[in-house]
Swiss-Prot record:
<dbReference type="GO" id="GO:0004645">
    <property type="term" value="F:1,4-alpha-oligoglucan phosphorylase activity"/>
</dbReference>
<dbReference type="Pfam" id="PF00591">
    <property type="entry name" value="Glycos_transf_3"/>
</dbReference>
<dbReference type="InterPro" id="IPR000312">
    <property type="entry name" value="Glycosyl_Trfase_fam3"/>
</dbReference>
<protein>
    <recommendedName>
        <fullName>Putative thymidine phosphorylase</fullName>
        <ecNumber>2.4.2.4</ecNumber>
    </recommendedName>
</protein>
<dbReference type="InterPro" id="IPR013466">
    <property type="entry name" value="Thymidine/AMP_Pase"/>
</dbReference>
<keyword id="KW-0328">Glycosyltransferase</keyword>
<dbReference type="Pfam" id="PF07831">
    <property type="entry name" value="PYNP_C"/>
</dbReference>
<dbReference type="InterPro" id="IPR000053">
    <property type="entry name" value="Thymidine/pyrmidine_PPase"/>
</dbReference>
<dbReference type="InterPro" id="IPR028579">
    <property type="entry name" value="Thym_Pase_Put"/>
</dbReference>
<dbReference type="InterPro" id="IPR036566">
    <property type="entry name" value="PYNP-like_C_sf"/>
</dbReference>
<dbReference type="GO" id="GO:0006206">
    <property type="term" value="P:pyrimidine nucleobase metabolic process"/>
</dbReference>
<dbReference type="GO" id="GO:0009032">
    <property type="term" value="F:thymidine phosphorylase activity"/>
</dbReference>
<dbReference type="InterPro" id="IPR013102">
    <property type="entry name" value="PYNP_C"/>
</dbReference>
<comment type="similarity">
    <text>Belongs to the thymidine/pyrimidine-nucleoside phosphorylase family. Type 2 subfamily.</text>
</comment>
<dbReference type="GO" id="GO:0005829">
    <property type="term" value="C:cytosol"/>
</dbReference>
<keyword id="KW-0808">Transferase</keyword>
<dbReference type="InterPro" id="IPR035902">
    <property type="entry name" value="Nuc_phospho_transferase"/>
</dbReference>
Amino acid sequence: MSPADTARPQLKIRSVALDTGRENVVVISRRSRALRPEVFSGFSRVELRCNSRTLLATLLITDDDALVGPDEIGLSEPALRRFAEPAGMLATVSPATPPESLEAVRAKIRGETLSDEAIAAVIEDLAHYRYSDMEIAAFLIGSASFMTSGELLALTHAMANAGTQLTWPEPVVVDKHCIGGIPGNRTSMVVVPIVAAHGLTIPKTSSRAITSPAGTADTMEVLARVNVGAEEMKSIVAACNGCVIWGGHVNLSPADDILISVERPLSLDTREQMVASILSKKLAAGSTHLLLDLPVGPTAKLTSGAEAMRLRKLFEFVGDRFGLKVEVITTDGRQPIGHGIGPVLEARDVMAVLGNEPQAPADLREKSLRLAAHLLEYDPKLRGGAGYSRARELLDSGAALKQMQKIIDAQGPSAGRSELGDLAFDVGAASDGVVSAIDCLRLNRLARTAGAPVNKGAGIRLYKKIGDRVDQGEPLYRVFTCDPSEHDLAAAAASANNGYVLDGPNGPH
Protein backbone atom coordinates (compact mmCIF):
# COMPACT_ATOMS: atom_id res chain seq x y z
CA MET A 1 0.00 0.00 0.00
CA SER A 2 1.08 3.56 -0.65
CA PRO A 3 1.58 5.94 2.33
CA ALA A 4 -1.67 7.67 1.37
CA ASP A 5 -3.52 4.35 1.48
CA THR A 6 -2.01 3.52 4.87
CA ALA A 7 -3.30 6.82 6.26
CA ARG A 8 -6.85 6.12 5.10
CA PRO A 9 -9.20 4.04 7.27
CA GLN A 10 -9.29 0.41 6.21
CA LEU A 11 -12.67 -1.23 5.80
CA LYS A 12 -13.49 -4.91 5.83
CA ILE A 13 -14.89 -6.17 2.50
CA ARG A 14 -18.39 -7.60 2.74
CA SER A 15 -20.61 -9.12 0.07
CA VAL A 16 -24.02 -7.45 -0.18
CA ALA A 17 -27.01 -8.92 -2.00
CA LEU A 18 -27.73 -6.06 -4.42
CA ASP A 19 -28.75 -6.48 -8.05
CA THR A 20 -26.76 -3.72 -9.75
CA GLY A 21 -26.84 -5.08 -13.27
CA ARG A 22 -23.39 -4.72 -14.77
CA GLU A 23 -22.37 -1.70 -12.68
CA ASN A 24 -19.79 -1.90 -9.89
CA VAL A 25 -21.41 -0.57 -6.70
CA VAL A 26 -19.97 -0.28 -3.20
CA VAL A 27 -21.89 0.57 -0.02
CA ILE A 28 -20.56 2.23 3.13
CA SER A 29 -22.25 3.27 6.35
CA ARG A 30 -23.04 6.91 7.00
CA ARG A 31 -21.19 6.41 10.31
CA SER A 32 -18.06 5.07 8.62
CA ARG A 33 -14.74 6.72 9.47
CA ALA A 34 -13.92 6.61 5.77
CA LEU A 35 -16.93 8.75 4.81
CA ARG A 36 -15.76 12.33 4.44
CA PRO A 37 -18.81 14.48 3.59
CA GLU A 38 -16.66 17.12 1.90
CA VAL A 39 -15.38 14.45 -0.54
CA PHE A 40 -18.00 11.72 -0.81
CA SER A 41 -21.70 11.80 -1.54
CA GLY A 42 -24.17 9.27 -2.84
CA PHE A 43 -23.40 8.14 -6.40
CA SER A 44 -19.84 9.51 -6.21
CA ARG A 45 -17.26 7.58 -8.21
CA VAL A 46 -14.73 5.97 -5.89
CA GLU A 47 -11.62 3.84 -6.16
CA LEU A 48 -11.29 0.75 -4.01
CA ARG A 49 -7.79 -0.58 -3.23
CA CYS A 50 -6.64 -3.84 -1.69
CA ASN A 51 -3.09 -5.14 -2.09
CA SER A 52 -2.26 -4.31 -5.71
CA ARG A 53 -5.85 -4.44 -6.97
CA THR A 54 -8.01 -1.43 -7.76
CA LEU A 55 -11.66 -1.09 -8.72
CA LEU A 56 -13.70 1.90 -9.86
CA ALA A 57 -17.24 1.86 -8.51
CA THR A 58 -20.31 3.94 -7.74
CA LEU A 59 -20.80 4.73 -4.06
CA LEU A 60 -24.03 4.23 -2.12
CA ILE A 61 -24.42 5.40 1.48
CA THR A 62 -26.66 3.54 3.93
CA ASP A 63 -28.06 4.16 7.41
CA ASP A 64 -28.77 0.44 7.85
CA ASP A 65 -26.04 -1.21 9.92
CA ALA A 66 -27.54 -4.59 9.07
CA LEU A 67 -26.45 -4.03 5.47
CA VAL A 68 -22.92 -2.84 6.27
CA GLY A 69 -21.39 -1.79 9.56
CA PRO A 70 -19.29 1.35 10.19
CA ASP A 71 -16.05 -0.62 9.69
CA GLU A 72 -17.20 -2.44 6.55
CA ILE A 73 -17.55 -1.77 2.84
CA GLY A 74 -20.17 -3.73 0.93
CA LEU A 75 -19.55 -4.85 -2.64
CA SER A 76 -22.29 -5.80 -5.06
CA GLU A 77 -21.91 -9.19 -6.76
CA PRO A 78 -20.36 -7.78 -9.98
CA ALA A 79 -17.96 -5.60 -7.97
CA LEU A 80 -16.88 -8.48 -5.70
CA ARG A 81 -16.32 -10.77 -8.69
CA ARG A 82 -14.25 -8.23 -10.62
CA PHE A 83 -12.26 -7.05 -7.61
CA ALA A 84 -11.26 -10.68 -7.00
CA GLU A 85 -10.49 -10.11 -3.32
CA PRO A 86 -12.42 -12.26 -0.83
CA ALA A 87 -14.82 -10.97 1.79
CA GLY A 88 -13.02 -10.18 5.03
CA MET A 89 -9.99 -8.55 3.41
CA LEU A 90 -9.20 -4.93 4.28
CA ALA A 91 -9.52 -2.23 1.63
CA THR A 92 -9.33 1.54 1.36
CA VAL A 93 -11.70 3.82 -0.52
CA SER A 94 -10.80 7.16 -2.09
CA PRO A 95 -12.25 9.57 -4.66
CA ALA A 96 -11.77 8.16 -8.15
CA THR A 97 -9.77 9.95 -10.79
CA PRO A 98 -12.05 10.08 -13.85
CA PRO A 99 -10.77 8.08 -16.85
CA GLU A 100 -8.91 10.33 -19.28
CA SER A 101 -11.12 9.03 -22.08
CA LEU A 102 -14.09 10.90 -20.59
CA GLU A 103 -12.72 14.01 -22.28
CA ALA A 104 -13.49 12.30 -25.60
CA VAL A 105 -17.07 11.74 -24.44
CA ARG A 106 -17.40 15.43 -23.61
CA ALA A 107 -15.94 16.30 -27.02
CA LYS A 108 -18.50 14.08 -28.74
CA ILE A 109 -21.33 15.78 -26.85
CA ARG A 110 -19.96 19.11 -28.12
CA GLY A 111 -20.30 17.80 -31.67
CA GLU A 112 -16.68 17.01 -32.39
CA THR A 113 -15.43 14.09 -34.48
CA LEU A 114 -13.34 11.63 -32.48
CA SER A 115 -10.03 10.13 -33.57
CA ASP A 116 -9.48 6.38 -33.80
CA GLU A 117 -7.29 6.58 -30.69
CA ALA A 118 -9.94 8.44 -28.69
CA ILE A 119 -12.62 5.89 -29.55
CA ALA A 120 -10.27 3.01 -28.71
CA ALA A 121 -9.57 4.61 -25.31
CA VAL A 122 -13.29 4.97 -24.56
CA ILE A 123 -13.98 1.33 -25.44
CA GLU A 124 -10.95 0.13 -23.45
CA ASP A 125 -12.14 1.93 -20.31
CA LEU A 126 -15.74 0.91 -20.89
CA ALA A 127 -14.84 -2.77 -21.32
CA HIS A 128 -12.91 -2.68 -18.03
CA TYR A 129 -15.91 -1.22 -16.16
CA ARG A 130 -14.31 2.17 -15.53
CA TYR A 131 -17.47 3.99 -16.63
CA SER A 132 -20.66 4.40 -14.65
CA ASP A 133 -23.98 3.85 -16.40
CA MET A 134 -24.47 7.63 -16.53
CA GLU A 135 -21.13 8.07 -18.28
CA ILE A 136 -21.96 5.29 -20.74
CA ALA A 137 -25.30 6.97 -21.46
CA ALA A 138 -23.47 10.23 -22.16
CA PHE A 139 -21.27 8.48 -24.74
CA LEU A 140 -24.27 6.83 -26.39
CA ILE A 141 -26.32 10.03 -26.57
CA GLY A 142 -23.37 11.98 -27.92
CA SER A 143 -22.79 9.34 -30.60
CA ALA A 144 -26.49 9.11 -31.45
CA SER A 145 -26.58 12.68 -32.78
CA PHE A 146 -24.06 11.90 -35.52
CA MET A 147 -21.27 9.46 -36.31
CA THR A 148 -18.95 9.68 -39.30
CA SER A 149 -18.02 6.63 -41.36
CA GLY A 150 -14.51 6.85 -39.91
CA GLU A 151 -15.86 6.84 -36.37
CA LEU A 152 -18.05 3.84 -37.18
CA LEU A 153 -15.06 1.90 -38.48
CA ALA A 154 -13.00 2.85 -35.42
CA LEU A 155 -15.81 1.88 -33.05
CA THR A 156 -16.30 -1.51 -34.73
CA HIS A 157 -12.56 -2.21 -34.65
CA ALA A 158 -12.17 -1.18 -31.01
CA MET A 159 -15.16 -3.24 -29.88
CA ALA A 160 -13.98 -6.34 -31.77
CA ASN A 161 -10.51 -6.09 -30.21
CA ALA A 162 -11.69 -5.48 -26.64
CA GLY A 163 -12.38 -9.13 -25.76
CA THR A 164 -11.76 -12.69 -26.92
CA GLN A 165 -10.87 -13.11 -30.60
CA LEU A 166 -11.41 -16.54 -32.11
CA THR A 167 -9.58 -18.09 -35.06
CA TRP A 168 -10.46 -21.22 -37.01
CA PRO A 169 -8.39 -23.50 -39.24
CA GLU A 170 -11.03 -23.58 -41.98
CA PRO A 171 -10.82 -20.98 -44.79
CA VAL A 172 -14.61 -20.51 -44.85
CA VAL A 173 -16.40 -19.84 -41.54
CA VAL A 174 -20.04 -18.86 -42.01
CA ASP A 175 -22.57 -17.20 -39.73
CA LYS A 176 -26.03 -15.71 -39.89
CA HIS A 177 -27.67 -12.98 -37.88
CA CYS A 178 -31.11 -11.40 -37.71
CA ILE A 179 -31.51 -7.87 -36.38
CA GLY A 180 -34.53 -9.08 -34.40
CA GLY A 181 -37.91 -7.63 -33.60
CA ILE A 182 -39.98 -10.51 -35.00
CA PRO A 183 -41.54 -12.94 -32.49
CA GLY A 184 -40.57 -16.57 -33.00
CA ASN A 185 -38.24 -16.46 -36.01
CA ARG A 186 -35.90 -19.01 -34.45
CA THR A 187 -34.25 -19.79 -37.81
CA SER A 188 -30.67 -20.01 -36.48
CA MET A 189 -31.46 -23.22 -34.60
CA VAL A 190 -32.62 -24.83 -37.85
CA VAL A 191 -29.97 -23.29 -40.10
CA VAL A 192 -26.97 -24.25 -37.94
CA PRO A 193 -27.55 -28.03 -38.03
CA ILE A 194 -28.36 -27.95 -41.76
CA VAL A 195 -25.14 -26.10 -42.59
CA ALA A 196 -23.07 -28.14 -40.12
CA ALA A 197 -24.45 -31.40 -41.53
CA HIS A 198 -23.25 -30.29 -44.97
CA GLY A 199 -19.74 -29.82 -43.59
CA LEU A 200 -19.32 -26.05 -43.40
CA THR A 201 -18.11 -24.49 -40.15
CA ILE A 202 -20.76 -22.38 -38.39
CA PRO A 203 -19.82 -21.42 -34.81
CA LYS A 204 -23.00 -19.62 -33.79
CA THR A 205 -22.71 -17.32 -30.79
CA SER A 206 -26.09 -15.90 -29.84
CA SER A 207 -27.54 -13.35 -27.48
CA ARG A 208 -29.99 -13.61 -24.63
CA ALA A 209 -33.20 -11.63 -24.77
CA ILE A 210 -33.08 -8.03 -23.60
CA THR A 211 -36.42 -6.62 -24.74
CA SER A 212 -37.80 -9.68 -26.56
CA PRO A 213 -39.45 -12.76 -25.01
CA ALA A 214 -36.64 -15.06 -26.19
CA GLY A 215 -33.18 -14.81 -27.66
CA THR A 216 -31.62 -17.69 -29.54
CA ALA A 217 -29.49 -18.50 -26.48
CA ASP A 218 -32.60 -18.59 -24.24
CA THR A 219 -34.34 -20.98 -26.62
CA MET A 220 -31.31 -23.24 -27.13
CA GLU A 221 -30.95 -23.40 -23.35
CA VAL A 222 -34.23 -25.34 -23.25
CA LEU A 223 -32.41 -28.11 -25.15
CA ALA A 224 -28.76 -27.80 -24.13
CA ARG A 225 -26.21 -25.92 -22.05
CA VAL A 226 -25.22 -22.60 -23.65
CA ASN A 227 -22.75 -21.21 -21.06
CA VAL A 228 -19.68 -22.49 -22.89
CA GLY A 229 -16.18 -20.99 -22.77
CA ALA A 230 -13.95 -20.31 -25.77
CA GLU A 231 -11.81 -23.46 -25.56
CA GLU A 232 -14.79 -25.74 -25.04
CA MET A 233 -16.56 -23.99 -27.90
CA LYS A 234 -13.63 -24.81 -30.20
CA SER A 235 -13.82 -28.48 -29.18
CA ILE A 236 -17.55 -28.62 -29.88
CA VAL A 237 -17.13 -27.00 -33.30
CA ALA A 238 -14.26 -29.36 -34.15
CA ALA A 239 -16.51 -32.32 -33.38
CA CYS A 240 -19.81 -31.00 -34.81
CA ASN A 241 -18.87 -28.26 -37.34
CA GLY A 242 -21.09 -25.91 -35.37
CA CYS A 243 -22.63 -24.87 -32.07
CA VAL A 244 -25.35 -22.61 -30.66
CA ILE A 245 -24.04 -20.96 -27.50
CA TRP A 246 -24.38 -17.73 -25.52
CA GLY A 247 -21.81 -15.23 -26.76
CA GLY A 248 -21.57 -13.49 -23.39
CA HIS A 249 -19.79 -16.49 -21.87
CA VAL A 250 -17.11 -16.39 -24.58
CA ASN A 251 -16.44 -12.69 -23.89
CA LEU A 252 -16.78 -11.61 -27.52
CA SER A 253 -16.93 -7.81 -27.80
CA PRO A 254 -17.70 -7.33 -24.07
CA ALA A 255 -18.06 -3.58 -24.56
CA ASP A 256 -21.08 -4.26 -26.75
CA ASP A 257 -22.93 -6.08 -23.97
CA ILE A 258 -22.24 -3.13 -21.66
CA LEU A 259 -23.45 -0.59 -24.23
CA ILE A 260 -26.61 -2.61 -24.92
CA SER A 261 -27.47 -2.80 -21.21
CA VAL A 262 -27.62 1.01 -21.14
CA GLU A 263 -29.05 1.54 -24.65
CA ARG A 264 -32.20 -0.48 -24.23
CA PRO A 265 -33.72 1.33 -21.21
CA LEU A 266 -33.08 4.60 -23.08
CA SER A 267 -34.62 3.19 -26.31
CA LEU A 268 -31.48 4.21 -28.18
CA ASP A 269 -31.12 2.13 -31.33
CA THR A 270 -29.08 4.01 -33.92
CA ARG A 271 -28.16 2.27 -37.15
CA GLU A 272 -24.45 2.96 -36.63
CA GLN A 273 -24.48 1.42 -33.16
CA MET A 274 -26.38 -1.60 -34.50
CA VAL A 275 -23.80 -2.15 -37.24
CA ALA A 276 -20.86 -1.80 -34.83
CA SER A 277 -22.57 -4.11 -32.33
CA ILE A 278 -23.27 -6.93 -34.78
CA LEU A 279 -20.12 -6.79 -36.89
CA SER A 280 -17.72 -6.41 -33.95
CA LYS A 281 -19.01 -9.71 -32.55
CA LYS A 282 -18.81 -11.47 -35.92
CA LEU A 283 -15.25 -10.24 -36.46
CA ALA A 284 -14.27 -11.35 -32.95
CA ALA A 285 -15.90 -14.74 -33.60
CA GLY A 286 -13.63 -15.31 -36.61
CA SER A 287 -16.39 -15.37 -39.23
CA THR A 288 -15.40 -14.94 -42.89
CA HIS A 289 -18.90 -14.92 -44.43
CA LEU A 290 -22.00 -13.42 -42.80
CA LEU A 291 -25.64 -13.59 -43.89
CA LEU A 292 -27.80 -10.83 -42.40
CA ASP A 293 -31.58 -11.08 -42.17
CA LEU A 294 -33.38 -7.73 -42.14
CA PRO A 295 -37.13 -8.23 -41.52
CA VAL A 296 -39.29 -5.39 -42.87
CA GLY A 297 -42.82 -4.76 -41.64
CA PRO A 298 -45.16 -2.20 -40.05
CA THR A 299 -44.18 -3.18 -36.49
CA ALA A 300 -40.67 -4.49 -37.21
CA LYS A 301 -37.46 -2.57 -36.51
CA LEU A 302 -37.35 -1.63 -40.20
CA THR A 303 -40.64 -0.37 -41.60
CA SER A 304 -39.71 0.24 -45.25
CA GLY A 305 -37.57 -1.15 -48.03
CA ALA A 306 -35.74 2.17 -48.32
CA GLU A 307 -34.76 2.00 -44.65
CA ALA A 308 -33.54 -1.57 -45.13
CA MET A 309 -31.48 -0.55 -48.17
CA ARG A 310 -29.69 2.20 -46.23
CA LEU A 311 -28.87 -0.23 -43.43
CA ARG A 312 -27.73 -2.86 -45.93
CA LYS A 313 -25.24 -0.44 -47.49
CA LEU A 314 -23.88 0.44 -44.05
CA PHE A 315 -23.31 -3.23 -43.19
CA GLU A 316 -21.65 -3.87 -46.55
CA PHE A 317 -19.40 -0.81 -46.21
CA VAL A 318 -18.06 -1.83 -42.80
CA GLY A 319 -17.81 -5.52 -43.72
CA ASP A 320 -15.76 -4.70 -46.82
CA ARG A 321 -13.30 -2.60 -44.81
CA PHE A 322 -12.59 -5.52 -42.46
CA GLY A 323 -12.51 -8.27 -45.08
CA LEU A 324 -15.79 -9.79 -43.94
CA LYS A 325 -18.05 -10.98 -46.75
CA VAL A 326 -21.50 -9.64 -45.83
CA GLU A 327 -24.66 -10.67 -47.68
CA VAL A 328 -27.86 -8.89 -46.66
CA ILE A 329 -31.38 -10.07 -47.45
CA THR A 330 -34.71 -8.49 -46.54
CA THR A 331 -37.49 -10.76 -45.32
CA ASP A 332 -41.18 -10.50 -44.47
CA GLY A 333 -41.52 -8.92 -41.03
CA ARG A 334 -45.28 -8.41 -41.01
CA GLN A 335 -46.01 -11.18 -38.51
CA PRO A 336 -44.41 -13.73 -36.17
CA ILE A 337 -42.57 -16.74 -37.60
CA GLY A 338 -43.59 -20.14 -36.25
CA HIS A 339 -46.37 -21.16 -33.87
CA GLY A 340 -44.69 -20.22 -30.59
CA ILE A 341 -43.34 -17.14 -28.83
CA GLY A 342 -41.18 -17.83 -25.76
CA PRO A 343 -38.24 -20.22 -25.17
CA VAL A 344 -40.05 -23.55 -24.67
CA LEU A 345 -42.59 -22.96 -27.42
CA GLU A 346 -39.93 -21.79 -29.87
CA ALA A 347 -37.70 -24.78 -29.05
CA ARG A 348 -40.64 -27.08 -29.81
CA ASP A 349 -41.13 -25.35 -33.16
CA VAL A 350 -37.45 -25.87 -34.00
CA MET A 351 -37.47 -29.56 -33.15
CA ALA A 352 -40.74 -30.06 -35.05
CA VAL A 353 -39.16 -28.56 -38.18
CA LEU A 354 -35.96 -30.59 -37.80
CA GLY A 355 -38.03 -33.72 -37.19
CA ASN A 356 -40.18 -33.09 -40.28
CA GLU A 357 -43.30 -33.40 -38.14
CA PRO A 358 -46.63 -32.79 -39.91
CA GLN A 359 -47.62 -29.98 -37.52
CA ALA A 360 -44.27 -28.17 -37.86
CA PRO A 361 -44.66 -24.48 -38.78
CA ALA A 362 -44.30 -24.20 -42.55
CA ASP A 363 -43.13 -20.57 -42.42
CA LEU A 364 -40.23 -21.38 -40.07
CA ARG A 365 -39.24 -24.34 -42.24
CA GLU A 366 -39.32 -22.38 -45.50
CA LYS A 367 -37.48 -19.33 -44.18
CA SER A 368 -34.80 -21.53 -42.59
CA LEU A 369 -34.29 -23.41 -45.86
CA ARG A 370 -33.88 -20.16 -47.80
CA LEU A 371 -31.35 -18.80 -45.30
CA ALA A 372 -29.42 -22.08 -45.18
CA ALA A 373 -29.35 -22.11 -48.99
CA HIS A 374 -27.52 -18.77 -49.04
CA LEU A 375 -24.91 -20.04 -46.59
CA LEU A 376 -24.39 -23.34 -48.42
CA GLU A 377 -23.64 -21.40 -51.60
CA TYR A 378 -20.42 -20.25 -49.90
CA ASP A 379 -19.10 -23.81 -50.28
CA PRO A 380 -16.86 -23.63 -53.38
CA LYS A 381 -17.54 -27.30 -54.07
CA LEU A 382 -21.32 -26.79 -54.35
CA ARG A 383 -22.67 -25.90 -57.78
CA GLY A 384 -24.17 -22.43 -58.08
CA GLY A 385 -27.90 -22.41 -57.42
CA ALA A 386 -27.83 -25.79 -55.66
CA GLY A 387 -28.00 -24.38 -52.14
CA TYR A 388 -31.75 -24.70 -51.65
CA SER A 389 -32.02 -28.27 -52.93
CA ARG A 390 -29.05 -29.29 -50.78
CA ALA A 391 -30.57 -27.65 -47.68
CA ARG A 392 -33.90 -29.39 -48.28
CA GLU A 393 -32.14 -32.72 -48.80
CA LEU A 394 -30.31 -32.39 -45.47
CA LEU A 395 -33.53 -31.45 -43.67
CA ASP A 396 -35.83 -34.02 -45.28
CA SER A 397 -33.37 -36.90 -44.86
CA GLY A 398 -33.04 -36.37 -41.12
CA ALA A 399 -29.35 -35.43 -41.40
CA ALA A 400 -30.00 -31.99 -39.90
CA LEU A 401 -31.90 -33.48 -36.94
CA LYS A 402 -29.07 -35.94 -36.35
CA GLN A 403 -26.56 -33.08 -36.44
CA MET A 404 -28.64 -31.04 -34.01
CA GLN A 405 -28.72 -33.95 -31.58
CA LYS A 406 -24.95 -34.24 -31.92
CA ILE A 407 -24.56 -30.54 -31.08
CA ILE A 408 -26.94 -30.86 -28.11
CA ASP A 409 -24.99 -33.86 -26.77
CA ALA A 410 -21.68 -32.03 -27.20
CA GLN A 411 -22.89 -28.91 -25.39
CA GLY A 412 -24.37 -31.00 -22.60
CA PRO A 413 -27.76 -31.08 -20.90
CA SER A 414 -29.50 -27.91 -19.82
CA ALA A 415 -30.50 -27.27 -16.26
CA GLY A 416 -33.33 -25.02 -17.43
CA ARG A 417 -37.04 -25.65 -17.55
CA SER A 418 -38.40 -27.49 -20.60
CA GLU A 419 -42.11 -27.62 -19.71
CA LEU A 420 -44.80 -25.12 -20.59
CA GLY A 421 -46.30 -22.96 -17.89
CA ASP A 422 -49.24 -24.65 -16.18
CA LEU A 423 -51.44 -21.53 -16.18
CA ALA A 424 -53.00 -20.61 -19.51
CA PHE A 425 -55.82 -18.66 -21.12
CA ASP A 426 -57.09 -18.17 -24.66
CA VAL A 427 -57.52 -14.81 -26.36
CA GLY A 428 -60.47 -14.85 -28.75
CA ALA A 429 -61.49 -12.77 -31.74
CA ALA A 430 -63.79 -9.86 -30.92
CA SER A 431 -65.79 -10.44 -34.13
CA ASP A 432 -65.92 -12.41 -37.36
CA GLY A 433 -63.32 -11.45 -39.95
CA VAL A 434 -60.02 -12.15 -41.64
CA VAL A 435 -56.70 -11.43 -39.92
CA SER A 436 -55.18 -8.50 -41.83
CA ALA A 437 -52.37 -7.44 -39.48
CA ILE A 438 -50.51 -8.61 -36.38
CA ASP A 439 -48.63 -6.23 -34.09
CA CYS A 440 -45.27 -7.96 -33.50
CA LEU A 441 -44.19 -5.44 -30.89
CA ARG A 442 -47.36 -5.90 -28.84
CA LEU A 443 -47.12 -9.70 -28.91
CA ASN A 444 -43.49 -9.47 -27.81
CA ARG A 445 -44.53 -7.29 -24.87
CA LEU A 446 -47.41 -9.61 -24.00
CA ALA A 447 -45.13 -12.66 -23.93
CA ARG A 448 -42.72 -10.80 -21.64
CA THR A 449 -45.61 -9.77 -19.40
CA ALA A 450 -46.51 -13.46 -19.20
CA GLY A 451 -43.02 -14.13 -17.81
CA ALA A 452 -40.78 -14.94 -20.78
CA PRO A 453 -37.85 -15.33 -21.01
CA VAL A 454 -37.14 -15.48 -17.25
CA ASN A 455 -39.74 -18.24 -17.03
CA LYS A 456 -38.87 -20.30 -20.08
CA GLY A 457 -42.26 -22.02 -20.05
CA ALA A 458 -44.12 -18.73 -20.45
CA GLY A 459 -45.17 -17.47 -23.86
CA ILE A 460 -47.79 -17.49 -26.59
CA ARG A 461 -48.97 -20.24 -28.93
CA LEU A 462 -50.42 -18.72 -32.09
CA TYR A 463 -53.46 -20.24 -33.75
CA LYS A 464 -54.08 -17.62 -36.45
CA LYS A 465 -51.86 -15.76 -38.90
CA ILE A 466 -52.46 -13.07 -41.54
CA GLY A 467 -55.04 -14.22 -44.08
CA ASP A 468 -56.79 -16.67 -41.74
CA ARG A 469 -60.56 -16.36 -41.29
CA VAL A 470 -61.88 -16.35 -37.72
CA ASP A 471 -65.29 -16.40 -36.07
CA GLN A 472 -66.20 -14.25 -33.10
CA GLY A 473 -64.84 -15.84 -29.93
CA GLU A 474 -62.54 -18.23 -31.82
CA PRO A 475 -59.08 -18.34 -30.19
CA LEU A 476 -56.39 -16.25 -31.87
CA TYR A 477 -53.72 -17.54 -29.50
CA ARG A 478 -53.14 -19.08 -26.08
CA VAL A 479 -51.00 -17.44 -23.39
CA PHE A 480 -48.97 -19.61 -20.99
CA THR A 481 -47.69 -18.36 -17.64
CA CYS A 482 -45.96 -19.89 -14.63
CA ASP A 483 -47.11 -17.44 -11.97
CA PRO A 484 -50.63 -16.29 -10.95
CA SER A 485 -49.66 -12.61 -10.84
CA GLU A 486 -48.11 -12.78 -14.32
CA HIS A 487 -51.23 -14.61 -15.50
CA ASP A 488 -53.43 -11.75 -14.31
CA LEU A 489 -51.15 -9.06 -15.77
CA ALA A 490 -51.00 -10.82 -19.14
CA ALA A 491 -54.77 -11.32 -19.20
CA ALA A 492 -55.32 -7.61 -18.56
CA ALA A 493 -52.80 -6.64 -21.26
CA ALA A 494 -54.38 -8.96 -23.83
CA SER A 495 -57.85 -7.65 -22.98
CA ALA A 496 -56.71 -4.07 -23.54
CA ASN A 497 -55.18 -4.84 -26.95
CA ASN A 498 -54.75 -8.34 -28.37
CA GLY A 499 -52.42 -7.22 -31.18
CA TYR A 500 -54.63 -8.50 -34.03
CA VAL A 501 -56.44 -6.48 -36.71
CA LEU A 502 -59.41 -8.17 -38.39
CA ASP A 503 -61.02 -7.12 -41.66
CA GLY A 504 -64.76 -7.68 -41.55
CA PRO A 505 -67.86 -6.43 -43.34
CA ASN A 506 -67.46 -3.01 -41.75
CA GLY A 507 -63.72 -2.63 -42.36
CA PRO A 508 -60.69 -3.17 -40.08
CA HIS A 509 -61.26 -3.56 -36.33
